[in-house]
Amino acid sequence: STGGTVLPLAVNVREYDHLESACGNIIAKFGRLDVLVANAGIGHFAPIDEMEPAKWEELIDTNVNGVFYSIKACVDALKKSKGYIFTISSLAGTNFFPTASAYNASKFAVTGMTQSIMLDLRKYDIRVSTIMPGSVTSHFNGHTPTAEDAWKIQPEDIGELLVDLLKINPRTLPSKVEVRPSRPPSA
């Protein structure tokens, strides 16, 4: 939509106090928080025998702790608004592949954590969904999108999905949504 008010905030999702401050700034500006999208993520890919512990820790801290911190910092505001929480996991949260032990571990964790949080927060009329996309065109992991990425899910497709989910009658909760490209590239 157009004509809305935006409050740009830069935060480090690995720092809980940054997220508490951001949520406080949102409440101060808008009076409430209706939707949280926990979407920060990084990827380090290497076989386990080559994975550097510092890379593992950075990935888990961003992908798992960042989701937890985001939700924890905002949950009281979302209780008041009976809001909606979206976490962005991945198909890598239920499927595994070589060189992805850290990434798979983080996305399995996000998927499981989100489903448990959904059960915890339903009693407050907070809806919680995890979105599990497959290949998305993005700058993830240093990639520069090109025309060859046209077959992939586009970021705006995920945005449209979230808007559609917000429109569903609150009595219905799509708790885990897998999304794939309709037509993968030919071999």
Regions found by a protein language model. Name each.
Residues P47-I48, K55-E57:
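Substrate-binding pocket helix/loop in short-chain dehydrogenase/reductase
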Residues I126, T130-I131, S138, A147-A187:
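C-terminal helical subdomain
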